Amino acid sequence: RHYGIKPEPLPPGTRRGDCTTFDSSHTLSLSDYGSSPADKQSSEGAFPEAPAETEASGDKPAIDPNNPAANWLHARSTRKKRCPYTKHQTLELEKEFLFNMYLTRDRRYEVARLLNLTERQVKIWFQNRRMKMKKINKDRPKE
């Protein structure tokens, strides 16, 4: 269980791990982000398990319970692939940053909705941008 961590809502039609890019043909409404408690209960603990026979067959090495290091070496990565921001998203984030280096929660939600990003992506972009500005200011020679 993860305490104090809210699941990040995804825009409709996207799966976890997909890149979200700006799509001007689809504007999101608040109802797009909602889900009923029944949906949450049915999805909890429902991880599809791959059949053991598909892993044993083919060119993949068999899982050896006596050798956990070998299993770790052949484990699949669960990391999401890197999704670069579109030029439009970057431009809008930079404009927002020039206006205000820190976002309120409401403004972060609004920016995320407008750019078809998650609130977490916007938050982390602003954190990274502040660190970049700090580094630029530190490296600049003092006169």
UniProtKB/Swiss-Prot annotation:
Region (Disordered), start-end ranges: 1-75
A Pfam family this chain is assigned to: Homeodomain
Domain of life: Eukaryota
GO terms for biological process, alphabetical: anterior/posterior pattern specification; embryonic skeletal system morphogenesis; proximal/distal pattern formation
GO cellular component, one term: nucleus
GO MF annotation: an example: RNA polymerase II cis-regulatory region sequence-specific DNA binding
Primary localization class, coarse: nucleus
UniProt cross-references to SUPFAM superfamilies, sorted A to Z: Homeodomain-like (SSF46689)
Membership in a protein family: Belongs to the Abd-B homeobox family.
Functional summary from the UniProt entry: Sequence-specific transcription factor which is part of a developmental regulatory system that provides cells with specific positional identities on the anterior-posterior axis.
The protein's name in its UniProt record: Homeobox protein Hox-A9
UniProt source species: Ambystoma mexicanum
